């Protein structure tokens, strides 16, 4: 692959499962190349070649623990880490005036506010899911929620992930919940039901329910159920390989290159806004 004009990308969390998947994805997509790899200061993988660790051979990019030097020479950063880390990296991306693609989930309102503040100087693409299929599903969910009256159809969102996932509901489930709420013309906050236990009483009209399953090695299953009297519609997406998220993240970075600073979503990237 020619390096002339390629977008130089840094992968943070480079030794993790998603980090290695991102490195492999960048290696296969024209127009992008890995120029930096960052890990925690206590990572046993510091100093190793990022490409060799990801199984694509030596690419002469050692894994380091200081993001500042590599951000300074990069065009963008791909980030599927933790909320606290993503907030920190957003600040560094703002200093470097580069693209920051965030696939991290579990961010709090304060985390999101700090990321939005960084977007005054960085071009940030943030999404709970980077795949084309899920973002198209979100559009369909919004349309269905708009077309089907809340008095007639209840909305429930069911998701399942592998046993190692630490946040719930998933970022994708919340993305779909936001889409359903937008279709209904309401805010998700205050209308979401995330747990049911004991005597819960009857279902509140217009609420949006979430159910979470964890187990095995499931990459990600999501279903949005619109349940009416005598009929039920289910809109679903099943992720079979986390590489779909990595490819979407690289596509987002390439799309964001040259865009004005701001906070964008995958709907913007895919032209679904």
From Swiss-Prot:
Q: What is its main location?
A: cytoplasm
| Top enzyme class | oxidoreductase
Its recorded reaction(s) are:
(S)-2,3,4,5-tetrahydrodipicolinate + NAD(+) + H2O = (2S,4S)-4-hydroxy-2,3,4,5-tetrahydrodipicolinate + NADH + H(+); (S)-2,3,4,5-tetrahydrodipicolinate + NADP(+) + H2O = (2S,4S)-4-hydroxy-2,3,4,5-tetrahydrodipicolinate + NADPH + H(+)
Q: What is its EC number?
A: 1.17.1.8
Question: What positions does the entry give for NAD(+) binding?
Answer: 13-18, 39, 103-105, 127-130
Q: Which GO terms describe its biological process?
A: diaminopimelate biosynthetic process; lysine biosynthetic process via diaminopimelate
Kindly give the InterPro entries that the UniProt entry links to this protein.
DapB_C, DapB_N, DapB_N_CS, DHDPR_bac, NAD(P)-bd_dom_sf
The reply on keyword Oxidoreductase is yes
Active site, renumbered = 161, 165
Specify which residues bind NADP(+) according to the UniProt entry for this protein.
40
The family database entries (Pfam families) matched by this protein are listed as:
DapB_C, DapB_N
**Which GO terms fall under molecular function for this chain's record?**
4-hydroxy-tetrahydrodipicolinate reductase; NAD binding; NADP binding; oxidoreductase activity, acting on CH or CH2 groups, NAD or NADP as acceptor
Ordered alphabetically, the record's keywords are: Amino-acid biosynthesis, Cytoplasm, Diaminopimelate biosynthesis, Lysine biosynthesis, NAD, NADP, Oxidoreductase
* Compartment(s): Cytoplasm
Which pathway does it operate in? Amino-acid biosynthesis; L-lysine biosynthesis via DAP pathway; (S)-tetrahydrodipicolinate from L-aspartate: step 4/4
Residue positions annotated to bind (S)-2,3,4,5-tetrahydrodipicolinate are 162, 171-172
Q: Which Gene3D superfamilies match?
A: Dihydrodipicolinate Reductase, domain 2 (3.30.360.10), NAD(P)-binding Rossmann-like Domain (3.40.50.720)
- Could you tell me what this protein does? Catalyzes the conversion of 4-hydroxy-tetrahydrodipicolinate (HTPA) to tetrahydrodipicolinate.
Write out the similarity annotation: Belongs to the DapB family.
Listed name of the protein: 4-hydroxy-tetrahydrodipicolinate reductase 1
Q: Which gene encodes it?
A: dapB1
